[in-house]
A protein has these predicted regions:
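Alpha-helical transmembrane segments of multi-pass membrane proteins predominantly involved
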Residues: 1-539
Length: 539
């Protein structure tokens, strides 16, 4: 009888929870809409032409639903800002608070920028791309709200499975190989994280990280055993933010996956992953300062030193994201208000900087392909118009000339950027601004992003006098100086090298507009960084 009376209350709570998840409902609607179109029209040859037209409109459909989600999220931000009332959903599996809605806004914003990237570069993607992308976005949004270990695991797996598919969406040998590596490393990280979570559940008797029983249970267990369980658990978070030692998949995936997808990978999982890490670090009583400091130093050092030897722009940016994850981990080392505020500021700056960097790299692709095809004999240049699968059937030519897949593996080599800044000064200036922001040089927002992180670290060191913090501070400064050598490599080729033979490079008005939209905040946030820091302080 009690269970029967309790059932209406459970249903009421479920309905209230669904109402609070309106952005996710909108995204799920767009997901189902795209799936239904694909299922209905894919096998109908008479509708083949209609299918092609609908696919070309797919990004616009998703764009519309993302804009609706942004409107709803902005309304939720306003409500949370004035009410400041955390709303627990689905029996404390999720929480809707100001942090969650702000981070969801950043994720959906990055999705909109991804769709804009695809639109202005006229990327031709398969129909399955858009529903898979939306499923990944839904998983990321759930990650931002997850406060239950089971929900954290499920949302991370939703993101991971979607990421694996998006990596191999091109169906080339290179993307398949990198996708397989991604799956293997992801499965390993997932297994380790799940084992750590099971240990924590055994120690505490609860999966709710906001429950007092969770912290109390960990504190009553031997510190070595609890620390091992915690470290195993955070391995999954490190995998999603591309931090050492779970970064090995990053360079290959970034090199082979479509550039718009890589741009999204470089920031969206980090946004969700760092919020999950912040919630988890706040819940555990153990002092993880030393462990996190070592992870930060490893990520920064490995990312920067590996980038020094890279000759491919996308691989260079991949190692750059590893290093930036290390810098953001410094905020978790401090676990101070300034440190956590600095992490959010860093994420926002990185959103615009990384999206701009990959967009500008992608803009140069037609110039590279044009040069290669113009310099090939006619029988070979015609082969470039074929897909890799069709090209492989012509074995006599395949052995002697590059296919599109082979060109893709070499077209983003940094020497291929030679002289593009001379051919298009606007492009060169935009790329220069983005690169010096990644390096942390004024007058860009990247300077204040690193300055805030180092300020928080120095403040924590003065309060605790922990030697590991001083070493982390020194390592961070030295690596920032080292990073100048590879971040300025592309601008050097843009302006100080002669253009390649028969090369032309022009952008259209839409490409100029999107580049300005992404680069302008990088400059504005240098002069008005206090505006954003003041807003973030309310989180």
């Amino acid at each position: 009888m009690t269970n029967f009376l309790y059932l209406p209350e459970q249903l009421k709570q479920i309905f209230l929870s669904v109402n609070a998840l309106l952005p996710e409902v909108l995204l799920s609607t767009s997901f189902l809409f795209m799936i239904m179109i694909d299922l209905i029209l894919y096998h109908n040859q008479q509708n083949k032409g209609k299918m092609i037209k609908i696919i070309t409109k797919s990004s616009q459909i998703i764009f519309f639903f993302c804009l609706l989600s942004v409107v709803v999220i902005l309304n939720q931000i306003a409500q949370q800002f004035y009410i400041s009332n955390d709303l627990f959903l689905f029996d404390r599996m999720l929480v809707l608070d100001l942090k969650a809605v702000v981070f969801k806004f950043l994720i959906v914003l990055s999705t909109i920028l991804l769709l804009a990237h695809i639109y202005v570069t006229k990327k031709e993607l398969v129909a399955e791309f858009y529903p898979i992308l939306i499923s990944m976005v839904i998983g990321l949004c759930l990650m931002t709200m997850s406060v239950n270990l089971l929900m954290i695991y499920l949302s991370i797996e939703i993101v991971s499975v979607s990421s694996y598919i998006l990596t191999t969406i091109d169906k080339t040998r290179k993307s398949t190989e990198s996708g397989l590596k991604y799956i293997l490393f992801g499965a390993s990280a997932s297994a380790v994280m799940l084992y750590g979570m099971s240990l924590l559940y055994g120690m505490t008797g609860t999966l709710d990280i906001t429950s007092p029983d969770f912290s109390r249970g960990i504190s009553q267990i031997d510190s070595v055993a609890s620390t091992v369980a915690i470290v195993l658990t955070i391995s999954g978070f490190l995998f999603k933010i591309s931090a050492s030692p779970f970064h090995v998949w990053t360079p290959d995936v970034y090199e082979s996956a479509p550039t718009p997808v890589v741009a999204f990978f470089s920031i969206a999982p980090k946004i969700a992953g760092f919020l999950v890490a912040i919630r988890f670090y706040a819940a555990v009583p153990n002092n993880l300062q030393t462990i996190t400091a070592v992870l930060a130093m490893a990520s920064i050092t490995f990312g920067n030193f590996s980038a020094l030897w890279q000759n491919n722009a996308k691989r260079l940016l991949a190692y750059s994201t590893i290093a930036h994850s290390g810098f953001m981990l410094i905020g978790l080392v401090t676990m101070s208000q300034l440190g956590l505020t600095s992490v959010v500021f860093y994420l926002i700056v990185t959103l615009f900087t990384n999206m701009a960097a990959f967009l500008l790299v992608d803009f140069a692709e037609p110039a590279f392909v044009g040069v290669f095809s113009n310099n090939l004999p006619k029988p070979y240049s015609s082969l470039l118009e074929k897909t890799p699968a069709k090209a492989e059937s012509d074995s006599s030519l395949l052995e002697k000339t590059p296919t599109k897949e082979k060109i893709t593996n070499t077209q983003f080599l940094i020497p291929n950027f030679s002289g593009l800044g001379r051919l298009n000064p606007f492009y060169g200036i935009m790329m220069l601004i983005v690169m010096i922001s990644l390096a942390g040089i004024p007058p860009t927002a990247g300077f204040f992003a690193k300055l805030n992180i180092f300020s928080a670290l120095w403040e924590t060191y003065q309060n605790t006098n922990q030697p590991i913090l001083l070493w982390l501070f020194i390592f961070g400064l030295l690596n920032t100086a080292i990073s100048l050598f590879f971040y300025l490599k592309i601008p050097f080729y843009l302006f100080f090298k002669e253009p390649l033979e028969n090369q032309s490079f022009e952008l259209n008005s839409k490409q100029y507009f999107l580049a300005i939209i992404l680069v302008l905040p990088i400059l504005i946030l240098f002069f008005k960084a206090d505006w954003l820091m003041d807003l973030i302080s309310y989180l």
